[in-house]
């Protein structure tokens, strides 16, 4: 071998070794609601890859919603095409744990020093805990709130400094706004939102629950559920609410054609961007929460799915970065979700909330927060659809005047699909 040939061989080997030593670990990540989180994950990707240049993020096309996220994971677990990391609805972690798809984060948390000092408090960890182990770290948390078109509120003659505190007052204001013109609707209640979230909210607000403590019997058939479903029917009978899809209802508010919109805090930033200077928007509390009542925490958590040891190390770095004070602040500033991480609120967002009162509404509701309920067993998604379909029978007008009978049917149908 000539000296020149030897040099070429050494150079080639050096390049090969260098490439191997510094080959980036690729993490495949999938999250929901692309319209809401696109800017969020663009910022997180930039920050994370700058801090960890040896790890590259590959985002799959976003899930349509949390049900879609769970269904895809179930299928991909069979076909072995799971992403390394998935952002799952807070009420959808349970089925992934039950099927041994999600990876416990306990071994990773155990190795951390001063984890609590970084803002990871017990209540935050509890949200993603199942069978006494943490399987998901909350990434974005939301609560239901009211959005008001203050221009229409004033035109309707309502005291703008005393927005409705009860559903009776909401319906009264909706009637006044509805009377302003044929092209204006008083009220939009986004009941179709994922996971029956805005069905659970009014039931929980009265101290009710979805199932009995042993999870064997439907419990929303009592007074709390009766009140919640009849109030829902009143939105159509008295409040003039139309049978909008979620998208159409949202757009009617953004365009200035709806006076009140009930939805998640997650859309505050997007709403402000969409509305611009068309009208003044103000957020306010979810009405009629009685003493002892609660509201379900919406949002999502990061779940590790990869079983590869090397990828798990990289995945844990991404999970920590995204849920850290800095990562959580990005979420709050680019959406309307609240950061579950204490450090984000205490160090990064004090000035932000002072100048963004619409974002702060939900933060003031935090003492009311409870778990977003996940039905047990293999039929959880089926039960979600059953509840949706019964509510649709009221929204469509078919059974608008028989909320009691609809509730009885809903209870009976859900009971059939509970684990025996």
Residues covered by each model-derived region:
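C-terminal capping/gating helix-and-loop segments adjacent to ligand/active sites or protein-protein/ligand interfaces
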Residues: 360-413
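Extracytoplasmic/periplasmic substrate-recognition and gating elements
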Residues: 46, 50-51, 56, 156, ...
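Extracytoplasmic "Venus flytrap"
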Residues: 26-43, 62-66, 142, 194, ...
